[in-house]
From Swiss-Prot:
GO terms for cellular component: endoplasmic reticulum membrane; lipid droplet; perinuclear endoplasmic reticulum membrane. It comes from the Eukaryota. Residues 62-65 are lumenal. It catalyses: an acyl-CoA + a 1,2-diacyl-sn-glycerol = a triacyl-sn-glycerol + CoA; all-trans-retinol + an acyl-CoA = an all-trans-retinyl ester + CoA; 2-(9Z-octadecenoyl)-glycerol + (9Z)-octadecenoyl-CoA = 1,2-di-(9Z-octadecenoyl)-sn-glycerol + CoA; 1,2-di-(9Z-octadecenoyl)-sn-glycerol + (9Z)-octadecenoyl-CoA = 1,2,3-tri-(9Z-octadecenoyl)-glycerol + CoA. Residues 1-42, 86-361 are cytoplasmic. Keywords: Acyltransferase, Cytoplasm, Endoplasmic reticulum, Glycerol metabolism, Lipid biosynthesis, Lipid droplet, Lipid metabolism, Membrane, Transferase, Transmembrane, Transmembrane helix. Its EC number is 2.3.1.20, 2.3.1.76. The chain crosses the membrane at residues 43-61, 66-85. The keyword Nucleus does not apply. This is Diacylglycerol O-acyltransferase 2. Its main location: endoplasmic reticulum. Essential acyltransferase that catalyzes the terminal and only committed step in triacylglycerol synthesis by using diacylglycerol and fatty acyl CoA as substrates. Required for synthesis and storage of intracellular triglycerides. Probably plays a central role in cytosolic lipid accumulation.
Length: 361
C-alpha cells in the first residue's frame, strides 16, 4: 500500500519516473501487478476530479469558515481577502497554469476511458472561435479532458489556439475550487467573460461552450444522441458580434459515462429539477456510475466507455456588431447542418449503426 501511495504522489506531482520505479518494485502479488496498479491509478485520477467538481468548493468553504472560528483565523482571513481582491480574474480570462494542465494525473484520466481528440481541419491563430460542445452529458468529462488539460494534446493539434472551457459562474465563487478551475484555463460561462476573451485577449482564443447546458444533462442517457440546440441561439449572436468562427464538436461516448433516472416532462421530478435549475443555476441529476472496487456496483466512478471528441470544420462568421434576427437564424441553421454532417460522417466509424440519427430538441 505504501508503494501505491508513493506512486500516486508522483502522478500528482506530474512526474513519471517515481511511478515507474515504484511499479517495477512491486512484489509478485496478483492484485499488485503492474496492470492492476496502473488501472487503480486511472480510477483514482478520474475519481479525484469527480469529487473535486461535486464537493471541493463546498468542503473548502466549510473548512475555511471553521478555521475562521479558531486560533488560525488569520489564515482564513488572508485567503478571503485574496478572494475579494482577485474576484474579477476568472471573468478576464483566468489564470491558467501549463504545469497543472500537463500533470501526469490527466494522462491517467485520459487512459481510463480512454478519451481521444480527433482533428478534422486546421484552425487559424489569427482568428477567434466559439467551440460548441455536444452533448453535455452529466459532467462534460470529455470536454474537461480535451480542453481543460493537455492530456490529448489539444495545443499540439491546434497550435496557436488557446482553449477556454466555460462552466457555471457559481463555481468561481467557491474558495480553492476557483483556483483549481482557473489553473486549467476554465472560465465562467457568461456573456461578459466571453465578450472579454473574444475582444480584449487578442486572437487565437477558443471559448468552449456546452451549448445544451443543464437542460441537456437532464435528458442524457446511454445510447441516446439528443442535443438541446433548436432554441439555443445566444452563442451564435455572440459569435456574430465578435466575428468569431463557429466550430461544432460532437463527443461520441459522452452520454455513456453515467446512467441516470430521467424524469419525463410534466412529472414531479422534472418540475423539481427545472425549479432548482431556475433559481440555483444547475439541475440536480439522479445518476450513478460504478464503484471504486467493482464495475458491477453503484458509485461515482464513471463507466469506462470510450469518449471520442471530433472537432468539426469551422464556420466562417463575419463581424456584425448589431446582428439581426435573420442573421442569427442563418448562422444557427448553418451550425445545425454542420453538426449533423459531422455526426453522420463519424457515427459508423465509432461503432454506431448507420441507422442512428442525431436528434435536435
Amino acid at each position: 500500500m505504501k508503494t501505491i501511495i508513493a506512486a500516486y504522489s508522483g502522478v500528482l506531482r506530474g512526474t513519471g519516473s517515481s511511478l515507474l520505479s515504484a511499479v517495477h518494485d512491486l512484489p509478485s502479488i496478483p492484485w499488485l501487478s503492474k496492470s492492476s496498479v496502473v488501472r487503480h491509478l486511472q480510477i483514482i485520477s478520474v475519481l479525484q476530479w469527480v469529487l473535486s467538481f461535486l464537493i471541493l468548493g463546498v468542503a473548502c468553504t466549510a473548512v475555511l469558515v471553521y478555521i475562521f472560528c479558531t486560533d488560525l483565523w488569520l489564515i482564513a482571513a488572508l485567503y478571503f481577502t485574496w478572494m475579494v481582491l482577485d474576484w474579477n480574474t476568472p471573468y478576464k480570462g483566468g489564470r491558467r497554469s501549463s504545469w497543472v494542465r500537463n500533470w501526469a494525473v490527466w494522462r491517467y484520466f485520459r487512459d481510463y476511458f480512454p478519451v481521444k481528440l480527433v482533428k478534422t481541419h486546421n484552425l487559424l491563430p489569427s482568428r477567434n472561435y466559439i467551440f460548441g460542445y455536444h452533448p453535455h452529458g452529466i459532467m462534460c468529462l470529455g470536454a474537461f479532458c480535451n480542453f481543460g488539460t493537455e492530456a490529448t494534446g489539444v495545443s499540439k493539434k491546434f497550435p496557436g489556439i488557446k482553449c477556454h472551457l466555460a462552466t457555471l459562474a457559481g463555481n468561481f465563487r467557491m474558495p480553492v475550487l476557483r483556483e483549481y478551475l482557473m489553473s486549467g484555463g476554465i472560465c465562467p460561462v457568461n456573456r461578459d467573460t466571453i465578450n472579454y476573451i473574444l475582444s480584449k485577449n487578442g486572437t487565437g482564443n477558443a471559448v468552449v461552450i456546452a451549448v445544451g447546458g443543464a437542460a441537456e444533462s437532464l435528458n442524457c442517457r446511454p445510447g441516446k444522441n439528443t442535443v438541446t440546440l433548436l432554441h439555443r441561439k445566444g452563442f451564435v449572436k455572440v459569435a456574430l458580434q465578435h466575428g468569431a468562427d463557429l466550430v461544432p464538436i460532437y463527443s461520441f461516448g459522452e452520454n455513456e459515462t453515467y446512467k441516470q433516472v430521467v424524469f419525463e416532462e410534466g412529472s414531479w421530478g422534472r418540475w423539481i429539477q427545472q425549479k432548482f435549475q431556475k433559481y440555483v443555476g444547475f439541475a440536480p441529476c439522479l445518476f450513478h456510475g460504478c464503484s471504486f472496487f467493482s464495475s458491477n456496483s453503484w458509485g461515482l466512478v464513471p463507466y469506462a466507455n470510450p469518449i471520442t471528441t471530433v472537432v468539426g470544420e469551422p464556420i466562417t462568421v463575419p463581424k456584425i456588431e448589431q446582428p439581426t434576427q435573420k442573421d442569427v437564424e442563418l448562422y444557427h441553421s448553418m451550425y445545425l447542418s454542420s453538426l449533423h454532417r459531422l455526426f453522420d460522417k463519424y457515427k459508423t466509424k465509432l461503432g454506431l449503426p448507420d441507422s442512428e440519427t442525431l436528434e435536435f430538441i
